[in-house]
Amino acid sequence: MKSFAAAFAAAVLWSTPALAADPVADRYAAAMKAARWTGPLLASNAETLPKGHVYTEPYFFDGISGSDHHPGTSGFYQYGLRDNWTVGVQPFFSLGTQRHNREMAVGDFKLLSQVRVSHFTPDHRAPSVAIVTNLVLPTGKDDHLAALKQGHGSGSFAPEVGINVQQYFLLGNGRLLRARVNVLRQFPLRHDVTGRSVYGTGPDFRGHARPASKTTLIAGAEYSLTREWVLAFDVEADAWGRTKVVGRDGDGPRIRSTSPRSWNVGFAPAVEYNWSDRAGAIFGVWIVPEGHNTAASVTPAIAIQRFW
């Protein structure tokens, strides 16, 4: 009996390290429970929604470039198709501010799809990683424009692929720093163009255009100041290839134009307030200095998020 008890005690002693809780995991779990997030202004989540749940986050903004204002609304409306697969739509609407153009216009919508391949937990502290496959729809008007009217679309279907990464870092004060990285590449397809268009063609033009490809790199960070308040900061770099337009203006000679490449780098400080685990708001400003063949702009924005 004594030998059995000794053997049992030895087994317990040997197994205790394997069964004992990971103190770092415990600290991560406590910190994650004490933090609420909206997400930064620009960088997207690498997580997916639980199956059957819905996420809504409408954005309201005013893009300011020089003396021109371009107010509008966009956002994310997503559904958990599977626990590791989220789909959704990103609409875009803008409001004309010119005296002859004060109506609401529809821009290009984007269909969203994201498959998560890795999931951060307090016990498994590898980054969350998701593969992104989106599709831009040519819902905005790009040609057949009346005189003095602006276009709000590209006219092109544009597949987009990328990767989203998200990681948590536990700081010495017990609060969390959450970091995100997004890498995206967009490939617009060739499409027909008729008349006045966003590509600068005249009223009698007939031809086609291939919009520039676009590469986007976003790095974002959020610091959980308190349970409700979060400080956020994003840096986004965008690079565009060459847009090509080919056709004829009426009976004139064949036209072939190619735009130069362009790029810019902007940043977006923001403040989040989350009044519950399911709802919050963010206010920030996206500031883009003048880049290579791009104008400077300042875009204040506010968004309200809700998990259903």
Task: State each model region's role.
Residues 19-57, 63-64, 121-126:
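Outer-membrane beta-barrel biogenesis signature
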Residues 39-41, 52-54, 71-75, 107-113, ...:
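Hydrophobic, lipid-facing positions within transmembrane beta-strands of outer-membrane proteins
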Residues 44-52, 84, 118-129, 170-177, ...:
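Short loop/turn motifs that connect adjacent beta-strands in outer-membrane beta-barrel proteins
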Residues 56, 75-79, 111-117, 133, ...:
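Residues on the lipid-exposed face of transmembrane beta-strands in outer-membrane beta-barrel proteins
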Residues 58-62, 89-93, 131-137, 179-187, ...:
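Transmembrane beta-barrel strands of outer-membrane/channel proteins
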Residues 64-70, 95-104, 173, 261-262, ...:
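Solvent-exposed loop/turn segments connecting transmembrane beta-strands
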Residues 95-211, 252-261:
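Outer-membrane pore/translocation modules
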Residues 204-308:
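Outer membrane beta-barrel transmembrane domains
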